[in-house]
Regions:
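Aromatic-capped interface at the extracytoplasmic side
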Residues: 1-13
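Short polybasic amphipathic segments
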Residues: 9-12, 31-33, 50-53
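Short acidic-glycine loop/turn motifs at beta-strand connectors
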Residues: 15, 47-49, 91
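Short extracytoplasmic
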Residues: 15-43
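N-terminal post-signal-peptidase region of extra-cytosolic proteins
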Residues: 30-33, 37, 58-67
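Glycine- and acidic-residue-biased ligand/ion/polar-headgroup-sensing regions
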Residues: 40-42, 46-56, 81
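Local cysteine-cluster metal-coordination motifs and their immediate loop/turn environment
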Residues: 59, 64-65, 74-82
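Non-cytosolic head/periplasmic domains of membrane-anchored proteins
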Residues: 76-97
């Protein structure tokens, strides 16, 4: 890492508070982890340069159906769990000097 052009990461927020940052969305490292809150549990998967909610115990499953996100500015929201996943980082236009 270290400021490569187009580098991106993901931030996970619960109820508006940053609770986890994923600094490597590298395609060769697929893995999953659980985010457990007082409102429920979401299983987050990282891989293929993307991040997504693979399993959630919320009622509407909108976050699961949202699919993979991989571009700066994209978000996945689980409203029942008050969880937001956001891709942050430079776009190619931002990296031009």
């Amino acid at each position: 890492t270290g400021g490569k052009s187009g580098e991106k990461s993901a931030e996970i927020y619960e109820n508006g508070k940053l609770i986890k940052t994923i600094s490597d969305l590298s395609p060769d490292k697929e893995y999953s982890f659980d985010i457990k809150t007082e409102n429920g549990t979401n299983t987050i998967t990282v891989g293929e340069g993307s991040i997504w909610v693979s399993v959630a115990d919320c009622s509407n499953q909108t976050c699961v159906h949202a699919g993979k996100i991989s571009h700066a500015g994209q978000t996945v929201i689980c409203a029942p769990h008050k969880l937001v996943i956001k891709i942050v980082g430079e776009t190619s236009a931002d990296a031009v000097i």
